[in-house]
């Protein structure tokens, strides 16, 4: 019975092993359990170009197995796999596909059989008219797209059908590759967050893409260069846990070249060491905190309103924001910046620049400033006479020797501990609630008229009276 169902190669194989293994093989193929068999070949589909080629296929089975090729009458000639049978255990097979001169795609099926288990694997080869269809690397992604956009129900996505895709949104799947998405040239909205997309994520062919929600995945590089319509890019929190339970952050490279319409970008919690936003001339909101940046180029980002580059220990030198007149919110703390230039930022309201290496700051042109947090730096002098809207100032742990606060009567909280200030006049600051000026060199302090003061700490000074 076996010989009548197999071709010559398989018959020869069986004639050699039949005397020794007839009982074992027959028993294995009739038992309903265990009948486990696993077939793998890496990522994606088994798709060959017209030039042909070879692919390695791995088989793991608990019993003896067979594989056959089916399809058109010539499929066994142009698509061959060796060996075609094996015993229980693991084996490496070689799939060979010949070159092809036809225009239309051709296909065959590999059928793996062991006991009651049967697995079919599709093998496809593109013709010379290979651009007629879209080829996917991820079978789950392919199925999702075909279920929605395969209008002629041929279980293939033509280039014309691909252009019907305008919006894609999917979460919590095992999809690991978006290969094939490059043919969806009319795609405007993509939300593939909370998936397992890995390797290189290339979206540079999507010229109409406006929104890309790509966060919580596993890709190592992101290319959106040339996406001139892209307005919103969210690519934060791409991480996984290794076997030891520690977090790993794979995203190391982002290409934003020619993203001239981009207004919002978020790269929080990744592994970036360099970020060039110089082409992003429309950018208003940039978040690149919690990376390993040592290079950040925002020289062309004149429209910035919010910037968070905090917790990047490699960022040093000068942070020059003098070309950002619309800047309102700045987080640059836990960096190694030595100079902060906010000249011309006339609407800047919130500055968080603590735990850094700042030794030079000038806030004289930031007249709208209401919150200034610069503690634990190396600042020797601080002029806030023009910052009359200030309600919160923390300049603790610096090297300040004198400070004039006579015009800053809106202050509610003032923290100046661990400096070298010798005199402090806060008379008439009726809104002041909290004052911390411990561990300075104070010999005189005036808090007369501070009728709202609730918390006062001037320990560790040289005061003889209060």
Residue positions per predicted region:
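Surface-exposed binding patches on compact interaction domains or structured appendages
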Residues: 36, 61-94
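Conserved hydrophobic beta-strand positions in leucine-rich repeat
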Residues: 166-168, 190-192, 210-214, 231-235, ...
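LRR N-terminal entry segment and analogous cap-like coil->beta motifs
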Residues: 153-201, 205-206, 210
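Leucine-rich repeat
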Residues: 184-187, 205-209, 227-230, 248, ...
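Canonical leucine-rich repeat
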Residues: 178-181, 200-201, 222-224, 243, ...
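Bacterial Sec-dependent N-terminal signal peptides
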Residues: 23-47, 115-136
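A short beta-strand micro-motif common to beta-rich folds, especially ectodomain repeats
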Residues: 93, 103-116
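Consensus "Asn ladder" position of solenoid repeat domains
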Residues: 173, 195, 217, 238, ...
């Amino acid at each position: 019975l076996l010989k009548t169902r197999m071709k010559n190669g398989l018959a020869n194989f069986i004639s050699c092993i039949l005397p020794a293994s007839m009982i074992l093989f027959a028993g294995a193929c009739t038992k309903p359990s265990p009948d486990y068999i696993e077939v793998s070949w890496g990522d994606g589909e088994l798709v060959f170009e017209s030039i042909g080629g070879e692919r390695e296929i791995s088989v793991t089975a608990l019993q003896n197995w067979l594989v056959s090729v089916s399809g058109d009458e010539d499929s066994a000639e142009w698509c061959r796999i060796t060996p075609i049978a094996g015993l229980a255990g693991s084996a490496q097979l070689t799939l060979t596909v010949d070159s092809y001169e036809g225009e239309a795609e051709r296909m065959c099926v590999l059928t793996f059989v062991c006991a009651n288990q049967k697995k079919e694997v599709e093998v496809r080869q593109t013709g010379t008219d290979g651009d007629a269809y879209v080829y996917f690397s991820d079978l789950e992604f392919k199925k999702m797209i075909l279920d929605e956009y395969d209008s002629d129900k041929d279980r293939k996505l033509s280039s014309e059908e691909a252009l019907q895709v305008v919006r894609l949104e999917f979460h919590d799947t095992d999809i690991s590759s978006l290969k094939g998405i490059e043919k969806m040239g009319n795609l405007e909205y993509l939300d593939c967050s909370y998936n397992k997309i890995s390797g290189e994520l290339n979206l540079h062919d999507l010229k109409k893409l406006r929104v890309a929600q790509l966060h919580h995945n596993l890709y190592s590089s992101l290319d959106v260069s040339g996406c001139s319509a892209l307005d919103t890019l969210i690519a934060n929190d791409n991480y996984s846990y290794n076997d030891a339970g520690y977090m790993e952050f794979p995203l190391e490279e982002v290409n934003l070249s020619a993203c001239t319409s981009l207004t919002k970008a978020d790269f929080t919690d990744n592994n970036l060491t360099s970020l060039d936003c110089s082409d992003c001339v429309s950018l208003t909101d940039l978040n690149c905190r919690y990376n390993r940046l040592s290079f950040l180029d925002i020289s062309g980002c004149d429209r910035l309103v919010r910037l968070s580059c905090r917790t990047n220990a490699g960022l040093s030198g000068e942070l020059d924001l003098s070309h950002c007149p619309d800047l309102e919110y700045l987080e640059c703390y836990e960096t190694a910046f030595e100079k902060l230039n906010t000249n011309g930022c006339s609407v800047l309201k919130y500055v968080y620049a603590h735990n850094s290496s700042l030794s030079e700051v000038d806030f004289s042109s930031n007249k709208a400033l209401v919150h200034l947090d610069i503690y634990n730096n190396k600042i020797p002098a601080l002029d806030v006479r023009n910052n009359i809207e200030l309600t919160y100032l923390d300049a603790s742990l610096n090297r300040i020797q004198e400070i004039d606060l006579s015009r800053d009567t809106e202050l509610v909280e003032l923290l100046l501990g661990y400096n070298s200030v010798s005199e402090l006049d806060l008379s008439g600051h009726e809104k002041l609630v909290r004052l911390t000026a411990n561990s300075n060199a104070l010999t005189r302090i005036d808090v007369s008229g501070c009728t709202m003061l609730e918390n006062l700490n001037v320990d560790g000074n040289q005061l003889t009276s209060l």
